[in-house]
Amino acid sequence: MEQEQDTPWILSTGHISTQKGEGGQQTPKLEHHNSTRLMDHCQKTMNQVVMPKQIVYWKQWLSLRNPILVFLKTRVLRQWRLFSKHEWTN
């Protein structure tokens, strides 16, 4: 049970209410400093999650060009072999 007390969502005793902003739009209003800590924790966690995803997307994007290059290389090699074979037999 003591380990659970270290997590921000267990420590948060405040609650989020809404306040009217400009244009009558309701926005969340944090009423406890632990709620602010929870929001900061969530933001940091999201940032840690987003970065590896961006790296994965870049790797996928970079690997997209490789199959195309491999396809072109094999196609050219096949045509070259066919051409060479054809020249050899004639």
Swiss-Prot record:
Plays an important role in promoting lung pathology in both primary viral infection and secondary bacterial infection. Promotes alteration of mitochondrial morphology, dissipation of mitochondrial membrane potential, and cell death. Alternatively, inhibits the production of interferon in the infected cell at the level of host mitochondrial antiviral signaling MAVS. Its level of expression differs greatly depending on which cell type is infected, in a manner that is independent of the levels of expression of other viral proteins. Monocytic cells are more affected than epithelial cells. InterPro entries: Flu_proapoptotic_PB1-F2 (IPR021045). The keyword Thylakoid does not apply. Its main location: host cell. Residues 65-87 are annotated as: Mitochondrial targeting sequence. Is not encoded in all strains, and seems to be dispensable for replication. The record marks 66 as: Low pathogenicity. Keywords: Apoptosis, Host cytoplasm, Host membrane, Host mitochondrion, Host mitochondrion inner membrane, Host nucleus, Host-virus interaction, Inhibition of host innate immune response by virus, Inhibition of host MAVS by virus, Inhibition of host RLR pathway by virus, Membrane, Modulation of host cell apoptosis by virus, Viral immunoevasion. The keyword Nuclease does not apply. It is found in: Host mitochondrion inner membrane; Host nucleus; Host cytoplasm, Host cytosol. GO terms for cellular component: host cell cytosol; host cell mitochondrial inner membrane; host cell nucleus; membrane. Residues 14-28 have a biased composition (Polar residues). The gene is PB1. Residues 1-30 are annotated as: Disordered. It comes from Influenza A virus (strain A/Hickox/1940 H1N1). Signal peptide: none annotated. Belongs to the influenza viruses PB1-F2 family. Oligomer. Interacts with human SLC25A6/ANT3 and VDAC1. Interacts with host MAVS. It holds the Pfam family PB1-F2. GO terms for biological process: symbiont-mediated perturbation of host apoptosis; symbiont-mediated suppression of host cytoplasmic pattern recognition receptor signaling pathway via inhibition of MAVS activity. This is Protein PB1-F2.
